């Protein structure tokens, strides 16, 4: 299966993109949804401002889903949907549109990501607390096994764990403990007869990562295969070897893609793809590759085509697929696999002893482990122990002709997309049968308060025109919302005090003494290592809430991290809000995937400093933040 992860702006524009990609030889679809859709908000919600259509396509109701798949027969398509907290809702919309096209749900093929554990640990698009979230997953798996048997209702994602810093051992162990939590919940719900439980196991799929250390990554995949076979046989009694098969798709690593010398990302992507294709016994069933310029911004269709062609050259020009497993019998490979399996088993047992994956999320254990691993990785890069070509070694370069016109080297989203989506959803609400909508939402809430399966009530909501925000809002009233542990503490991931960090800590301490107290920073993990008192209230805050927190906590600097492309809308709002609150002397610093032209505009709007992926040295960043604070207070930035 060859796919590219795609979707942006609107359902209509994304549909055109999908049909172009299919015409180029893509064999399936991988749908990216925007953040409001992922987190259960409509485009006119205050929390959706600046985010509509940015990192994916907005789907607010069945009308949007119809537009998304116009002239694409869903009965013949294999569609992967990267959706988690609202996965049940998007599957209901997909099924409803497929039925309108005349397709039998029993023939539908595809995947919903639906792994909420990794949302608490990495991506952050959770909505409900772990218990109700696991109930939604359980209901959805039980429904699909009985009604959409070719569907993969959950794609357990070790991919995002690696992006959040996981080592290969942590990636294996936390994915397996997530799978155990899900399978135990389905088994204990009684919705699937014991004799048919093998069908549930057979539909569990995984979405993994593959880094540039491709030999170790290939061994990791073989370790995954071995452990999954053991767990499904021993814990769940599945005797059919086919049902125990480790089924996985992959997107290779994005964390390691660099803004500096981004042309080097192509060879990184190729090496990472080899990790999941070289070994036949552990080969991915579906592969999607990131684009070379993802560290710069949203890739263009041409960039996605390049990634697709890489797969096609490997599949159709090389001889890799003509051979059995070329590593079978290798003592080196078998030794590394055994090492990974042993260490992963130990970590699985540690998490299970805590009460399982959900308990390890609620206690903050898993998050702390990932934060510590990621901090260690960053420290190795800063120290030069881990070489990143073009970043901390071999950083002299010729001019890159691919970047001569940087504004055309990335895809941008029209500023009118959001206003059009807001107008469209208001029109949608005005034209539907409101009585039917109210009745469907009332039934949804009633069922949510019982142990009945929620899928039927969700389908009813989809068919009468309920919106994404209304469906999620109704369940928020029953289940509540969740704010996951940050994993940030004074003892997690604190760096060793090398010469540069010692100098930063001295600057922080001296500046604090000059200003009459310890420096206080709103948001921002790196401040801990430098000696800042960090105020971090989690994700998903409006500009007004950020300003209110800055006022309440009397901070010296506000740090904003925005990776979705909404920096041009949201950051100026924070700067204006601080000024209106009388905090003109509180500088704002911003980090994210921000093109140079946007960075210049933000600085003109009053932002003190802009950091992008090329700024890999966290210690140097913190030194610049201290200098920014000193400048804002009329102190010599070089004196501390």
Regions found by a protein language model. Give the residues of each.
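Flexible glycine/proline-rich, aromatic-decorated loop/lid segments
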Residues: 196-200, 238-252, 260-293, 299-320, ...
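Conserved, mostly hydrophobic/aromatic
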Residues: 25, 61, 102, 228, ...
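Conserved phosphate-handling catalytic cores of large alpha/beta enzymes
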Residues: 311, 610-639
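Short beta-strand/loop segments at the ligand-binding rim of alpha/beta enzyme cores
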Residues: 1-2, 245-248, 517-520, 580-590
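Flexible, glycine-rich loop/tail regions that form catalytic "lids" or insertion modules at the edges
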Residues: 300-301, 305-312, 316-503, 551, ...
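Catalytic alpha/beta active-site cores
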Residues: 1-217, 235-238, 242-249, 277, ...
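Short beta-alpha connecting loops at secondary-structure transitions
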Residues: 49-54, 79, 118-128, 161-165, ...
